[in-house]
Amino acid sequence: MPHPFDLSLYLVTDRRLTAERGLLETVEEAVAGGVTLVQLRDPEAKGRALAEEARALIGLLRPKGIPLIINDRVDVAAAVGAEGVHLGQDDLDPAAARAILGPDAIIGLSVGSLEELSASNLGPVDYVGCGPINATGTKGDAGGAIGIEGFAFLRSHIALPMVGIGGLKAEDAEAVMQAGANGIAVVSALCAAPDVTEAARTLKTIIETSRR
């Protein structure tokens, strides 16, 4: 049984966007505004540096009951005791990640098309990240935008909890939630916001209102 998790407002970090403010400060301000889950995504960091970032984030997040998900790096997630890992289509198979991390780990998987869904082993997966809904500049290999319609189509084929991702801003949140999302994953909408806490509060309010 995985750690409890809430996909409502899911922050995916980008060190390029948090350089001026700092990673820890950005995440702390985002959590103050209502972020419910944090993914550490830093593809440029080597293993040791990534582990140091992860340990610092765990120290910040765990006392607040917010899980830390590591992007791609199952080895780092295991080494630092992070709550979970998020895998892309070209990463380690979810079953292998589950075998390494154990039954309590949260395992997420990116899916952007019906073809990817058909090729995916969802058995060990706890949630699906679906997108990119909009064009995005924060992930070069994200693929073409699928739009709200594409998200809704995949939602109709996936029973697992789903989070929408990809170039999402506050004005997109209501439509994504109404298309069946369990939450919204954002990068620049928070990491590049002048006031991270206020931006998170705005998103969280829209998400909660859209559920009613």
UniProtKB/Swiss-Prot annotation:
What this protein needs as a cofactor is:
Mg(2+)
Residues binding 4-amino-2-methyl-5-(diphosphooxymethyl)pyrimidine are: 39-41, 71, 110, 139
Q: Which keywords does this Swiss-Prot/TrEMBL entry list? A: Magnesium, Metal-binding, Thiamine biosynthesis, Transferase
What GO molecular function annotations does the UniProt record carry, in alphabetical order? magnesium ion binding; thiamine-phosphate diphosphorylase activity
* Co-factor: note: Binds 1 Mg(2+) ion per subunit.
Q: Which Pfam families match?
A: TMP-TENI
Gene3D superfamilies in the record: Aldolase class I
- Name the coiled-coil region(s): none
**Known EC number(s)?**
2.5.1.3
Keyword Lyase among UniProt keywords: no
Q: Which residues bind 2-[(2R,5Z)-2-carboxy-4-methylthiazol-5(2H)-ylidene]ethyl phosphate?
A: 136-138, 167, 187-188
Enzyme kind, highest EC tier: transferase
Q: Does the keyword Signal apply?
A: no
Disulfide partners: none
Q: Which positions does UniProt annotate for Mg(2+) binding?
A: 72, 91
Q: GO:BP terms for this protein?
A: thiamine biosynthetic process; thiamine diphosphate biosynthetic process
What pathway does the UniProt record associate with this protein?
A: Cofactor biosynthesis; thiamine diphosphate biosynthesis; thiamine phosphate from 4-amino-2-methyl-5-diphosphomethylpyrimidine and 4-methyl-5-(2-phosphoethyl)-thiazole: step 1/1
Q: Which reaction does it catalyse?
A: 2-[(2R,5Z)-2-carboxy-4-methylthiazol-5(2H)-ylidene]ethyl phosphate + 4-amino-2-methyl-5-(diphosphooxymethyl)pyrimidine + 2 H(+) = thiamine phosphate + CO2 + diphosphate; 2-(2-carboxy-4-methylthiazol-5-yl)ethyl phosphate + 4-amino-2-methyl-5-(diphosphooxymethyl)pyrimidine + 2 H(+) = thiamine phosphate + CO2 + diphosphate; 4-methyl-5-(2-phosphooxyethyl)-thiazole + 4-amino-2-methyl-5-(diphosphooxymethyl)pyrimidine + H(+) = thiamine phosphate + diphosphate
The record's similarity note reads: Belongs to the thiamine-phosphate synthase family.
Q: Which HAMAP family match?
A: TMP_synthase
What does this protein do, in the record's words? Condenses 4-methyl-5-(beta-hydroxyethyl)thiazole monophosphate (THZ-P) and 2-methyl-4-amino-5-hydroxymethyl pyrimidine pyrophosphate (HMP-PP) to form thiamine monophosphate (TMP).
- Protein's name according to its UniProt entry: Thiamine-phosphate synthase
* Encoding gene per record: thiE
